[in-house]
Amino acid sequence: VPIVMVGGATGQIGDPSGKSEARVILSKEVVAHNAECIRKQLSRFISEDNAIFVNNAEWFNNMLYLDFLRDIGSKFSVNKMLTAESVKMRLETGLSFLEFNYMILQAYDFYMLNKKFGCKLEMGGQDQWGNIVAGTELVRRLSQQEVHGITMPLLINSSTGQKFGKSVGGAVWLDKNKTSVFDYYQFWRNTDDADVQKLMLYFTALPVDEIRNICSASINRAKEILAFEATALAHSGEEAAKAYLAAGAKFGFSDKENKIPTSSAIAKINTDEAVIDDLPTYELTLPAEGIWFPKLMAEAGLCKSNGEARRLIQGGGAYLNDQRISDPDFTAKAADFPNGSAI
């Protein structure tokens, strides 16, 4: 039985793994709200009848600090913790005592999952290796049991060299209130050429040979299929079809006649039904000198502030008319709005 754990407690600290600077500290109320939202989102993909959902706040919220130091902290060597990559890369820029404790907290999570549910295997991204190993050692010391860990390669954006992640910038959300279905579709449609085949292997159920053939035949058609399949997985085939048609109505279709063979349901969509009515719109009077792009994004409701928009641009997640905007100082002018509109 899979065990799905959300970090209602550890989310109050933030994992320093892979980070060059400290995370923004969220309030307890925000973390609790986020944890519940994540649980609900995950339940769309993993039935709560066939999995164990747990929040680590259950065992951390009532734990006494002195008890934790004595019973758990005594099992860890600071010398060994300092050899972890997540710690070493932060020593020069500064690592708070708060973040330094994260490894111990995650290790204790593994111990509690093993104790309460018999968990024998922890899975995570490759940047979690040190934390997972710490957990296996803690379980062995406290319970005299052998447990295991397995890590998987991180998803790396080829153009930025950064991992896909909500704290990095340019991330998308499963919640359509945070990322609209159309924006979710466009995120995948705008995948870098070098990443398309890899992401199709990860996020579609299409046969491997078919994926290779599609990518060889037309990288843009491959992007459409990737976007459609990923959107169908997160939001439903019906929503994916609407996003595909809306994008095609604005930018055109890469294979309108379905000449490239594919088993994807995208081939069954009638592209003659393409309309752009479903697109969220924002109208403005463009100044003669143009408008600073982060300001435009904020005013259009795409970001909460100019600063958030700048971070999104720097993270590689901002596009204008299917072209990535990489300069946070970019100014959009009349030429960027052919026929008086843009996406």
Question: What are the residue ranges of the model-derived segments?
Answer:
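Conserved nucleotide- and phosphate/pyrophosphate-binding catalytic cores
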Residues: L142-I343
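Flexible loop/turn segments at secondary-structure boundaries
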Residues: T10-I13, N61-N62, G130, I156-S159, ...
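Short, compositionally biased low-complexity segments
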Residues: G7-I13, F76, L199-F203
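Short connector loops/turns at beta-strand edges and beta->alpha or beta->beta junctions
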Residues: G7-G11, F110, N177
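Divalent-metal (Mg2+/Mn2+/Ca2+)-assisted nucleotide/phosphate chemistry catalytic cores
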Residues: R23, S27-K28, N34-M152, T160
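Short acidic-hydrophobic sequence patches enriched in Asp/Glu that either
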Residues: M5, S27-N34, K176, S180, ...
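Acidic/polar active-site rim loop that often engages polyanionic ligands
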Residues: Q12-V24, K116-F117, V181
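N-terminal catalytic cores of NTP/NDP-binding nucleotidyl/phosphoryl-transfer enzymes
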Residues: V1-D15, E122-W129
